[in-house]
Design a protein with these regions (language model features):
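ATP/nucleoside-binding phosphotransfer catalytic cores, i.e., glycine-rich phosphate-binding loops
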Residues: 131-138, 154-245
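Conserved Motif II region of HX4D acyltransferases
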Residues: 1, 144, 219
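Glycine-/small-residue-rich beta->alpha transition segments that form the dinucleotide
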Residues: 148-149
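Catalytic core of DAGKc-family lipid kinases
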Residues: 4-138, 142
């Protein structure tokens, strides 16, 4: 914001990656050139209702001199699955959809059937998650998500934003918890009631700590360790451009 005199102009995000979660949350998808053309049209005709406010996640790990900003963080087992897909599946040159399908099959083979092999994802490391004023979670999680996007991965919406701007979902590393997650996501039941093994929380400050535990913030990898936690804080609202008014 220091590069602009006065009010910061809205930020437009173009789809240019494998998942594009931020762009999708803002209604921007498909060909980035066509999306840019649409953005130019909106800018010429007036931004109006296309400007929305979004908080960012500010990550510090004790090593970076300035906070790293993002909107979607994956940790615990999810970070391992993302890295597995990036390192093992994407190099095969397959389409994004088929690559994600193969990754899902590998995760199921590892978690559900207990198959252990070098070419399959490994078990997640124990991690401790602390939320200011909300207590602490500790254990092995197959999924850990922290985001300021309106909707989480799989369409999950934890609800009440008054408890904090960062939304957290942690799923225990167990077959039963994973099946409950799939069932609740398919039938849009997530957040409607408490479910064993699925933790939905919100807060403005989140601390993640664990031996050799990786997190990925918008594609960038960070590692938490004992005595060197990762600290997440929500920022003040930032204006973004949403294509669908």
């Amino acid at each position: 914001g220091e590069h602009f005199c006065g009010r910061v102009p809205p930020i437009a995000v173009l789809p240019n990656g494998k998942t594009n979660l931020i762009a999708l949350d803002l209604g921007i998808h498909g060909d980035p050139i066509k999306a840019l053309e649409r953005i130019v049209e909106i800018a010429k005709s007036g931004l109006g209702d296309h400007v929305v406010q979004r908080e960012l996640i500010a990550l510090t790990d004790g090593q970076t001199t300035r906070p790293v900003l993002g909107m979607f963080l994956g940790g615990a087992g999810l970070a391992d699955y993302i890295l597995y897909c990036r390192d093992k599946i994407y190099p095969l040159g397959l389409s994004n959809g088929f690559s994600h399908f193969l990754t899902a099959l590998a995760v199921l083979a590892s978690l559900v059937f207990g198959i252990r092999a070098r070419f399959l994802p490994q078990s997640s490391h124990p991690v401790s998650i602390s939320l200011m004023r909300e207590g602490q979670l500790a254990g092995r999680f197959s999924v850990l998500i922290v985001t300021t996007l309106e909707r989480l991965l799989l369409g999950v919406d934890p609800g009440d934003s008054r408890r904090g701007n960062m939304k957290l979902m942690a799923v225990d590393q167990s077959v039963s918890a994973l099946l409950r997650l799939v069932w609740a996501s398919v039938f849009r039941r997530m957040g409607k009631q408490q479910m064993q093994g699925i933790h939905l929380e919100q807060g403005d400050t989140i601390r993640i700590e664990g031996a050799q535990s990786s997190v990925i913030l918008d594609g960038e990898i960070f590692r938490a360790s004992e005595g060197k936690p990762i600290l997440l804080r929500s920022t003040e609202p930032v204006p973004f451009l949403r294509l669908a008014a």
